[in-house]
Amino acid sequence: MELLCSPTSLSSSFALSSALLVPRSFSMPGTRRFMVLCSSQKESQMTVSVTGATGFIGRRLVQRLRADNHAIRVLTRSKSKAEQIFPAKDFPGIVIAEESEWKNCVQGSTAVVNLAGLPISTRWSPEIKKEIKGSRIRVTSKVVDLINNSPAEARPTVLVSATAVGYYGTSETGVFDENSPSGKDYLAEVCREWEGTALKANKDVRVALIRIGVVLGKDGGALAMMIPFFQMFAGGPLGSGQQWFSWIHVDDLVNLIYEALTNPSYKGVINGTAPNPVRLGEMCQQLGSVLSRPSWLPVPDFALKALLGEGATVVLEGQKVLPVRAKELGFEFKYKYVKDALRAIMQ
């Protein structure tokens, strides 16, 4: 039975039937159905190239793809780091490629997921600001060029590219969905150029742009930096606490990306945020409640600005972003409320 599922099963069916002395036209009850199921299973398997795979989101995505037996090609600038995160014993068959080898990985892939970019939660010097934008544009441009220059028969058919809710600018009163205009600040500019670069992909490639909010998970992102302070009874809101906090649980984001890979209806801009954004003050209260710790020690604006400079904008200002398109597409959020997400993370 295993032979029927092998890569050569269709081309060698005559040899197999001859060896078993079964006429080629003969079919046992249930055999045809079994072969169709095997073929369908094989066709549903993807080969996915991933940039930013060693990051917080990328690691979880690779684990999900691996769990579903898809082939994974990690496009990295540090092969040694990627090999530590994805050891061959735990990820058999994974391909890890440095930049000079990306071409061979992109060609023949079913899809590419582009998550690469320098983290923005740091002090913004002029050099860092240049690299925040440059790292995103450079990698996205390279990926798009490799896709476009692939032979038609080897070209990926899907590009899922990250962008961010920073596209909308910041507001304490506005509500943003996928049709809202772009903001005018630095991060909005970065996102516009980032998205514009991804949209240069070949017209036959389905492009999904995921505008990602604040990703919640225990192993990375904003929450990983906040939890230690709360555990030491030193947690509290940042700044006024009135800024909007458009969040998403990392598992929901990975599921959204996965759906964008497999569902042809997912194209264009899709907000990667939970349906119920909250003010940052409420989020901190919920985190304190889940941890059985008070949320009593606010961090004043001036302290954050002294620490992060212009980069303090990321935490002192926010935007209320709704996932209108994801809901239209029927995407099911596992975590719709921040308290449920925090409870799951801290279990």
Curated annotation (Swiss-Prot):
Record InterPro entries: DUF1731, Epimerase_deHydtase, NAD(P)-bd_dom_sf, SDR39U1
Annotated organelle transit peptide span: 1-37
EC code: 1.1.1.-
Entry keywords, A to Z: Chloroplast, Membrane, NADP, Oxidoreductase, Plastid, Plastid inner membrane, Transit peptide
The protein's enzyme class: oxidoreductase
Subcellular location: Plastid, Chloroplast inner membrane; Plastid, Chloroplast
Membrane topology of the entry: Peripheral membrane protein
Principal subcellular localization: plastid
GO BP, sorted A to Z: chloroplast fission
One function term, GO molecular function aspect: oxidoreductase activity
Residues noted as binding NADP(+) in the record, renumbered to the chain: 54-57, 76-77, 115-119, 136
Pfam families tied to this protein: DUF1731 (PF08338), Epimerase (PF01370)
GO cellular component, one term: chloroplast inner membrane
Tissues showing expression: Expressed in leaves, stems and flower buds.
Function according to Swiss-Prot or TrEMBL: Putative NADP-dependent oxidoreductase that acts as a positive regulator of chloroplast division. May play a role at an early stage of the division process.
Miscellaneous information on this protein: Plants silencing GC1 show greatly enlarged chloroplasts containing densely packed thylakoid membranes in mesophyll cells and leaves with decreased rates of CO(2) assimilation.
Alphabetized NCBIfam families for the sequence: yfcH
Oligomeric form and interacting partners: Can form homodimers.
Protein name: Epimerase family protein SDR39U1 homolog, chloroplastic
Organism, scientific name: Arabidopsis thaliana
Gene designation per UniProt: GC1
